[in-house]
């Protein structure tokens, strides 16, 4: 009790398990599930959606909503293949609008997303749904396994034939110079 599959060193002390308890928004990680709904409903990777400015006015919003691509640019007619690879927000919002929110909400439940937690608005296209990392990994495993859902399970320990128990808790610290070098490379990659 109090151990974690993924987390910080504080995990054991405060017993907050990020795998089971954290529920960050999926963001662009949600887009493959949206596109899956599109492909199931007659769209294909070559289908074209307009990537152009769009404005939504809604009394429930404090202001108008103008979704944008992360680049701040618009790309005109865009194939779904390119839109998914480039994570184009406008295409995703328009696609959700064309498909209908109810249809997409129904479809993504096949991946284990909980109906009562799925947003009922166009922000869903941008991943406003919150999910635990375990739920997210399970959903993606369905895609990776060709549509087969496999229930994740926890391996507590592995005992070798000589009765030796593998210790997964042993960590190795790399040479500090190598660590600093890699951190520099990682920072440069962030800015690409």
What are these regions (language model features)?
Residues 22-27, 72-76, 80, 84, ...:
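Secondary-structure capping and boundary motifs in well-ordered enzyme cores
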Residues 8-9, 13-24, 36-37, 143-144, ...:
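Active-site beta-strand/loop architecture of penicillin-binding DD-peptidases
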Residues 13-21, 89-90, 119-124:
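Glycine- and acidic
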Residues 1-7, 12, 190-191:
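Single conserved hydrophobic/aromatic residue that forms the stacking wall/gate
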Residues 24-51, 83, 139-143:
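Active-site SXXK
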Residues 99-116:
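Short, charged, amphipathic alpha-helices and their helix-cap/turn boundaries
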Residues 111-166:
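Active-site-proximal helix/loop microenvironment
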Residues 43-104, 149, 161-189:
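Conserved catalytic neighborhood of penicillin-recognizing serine enzymes
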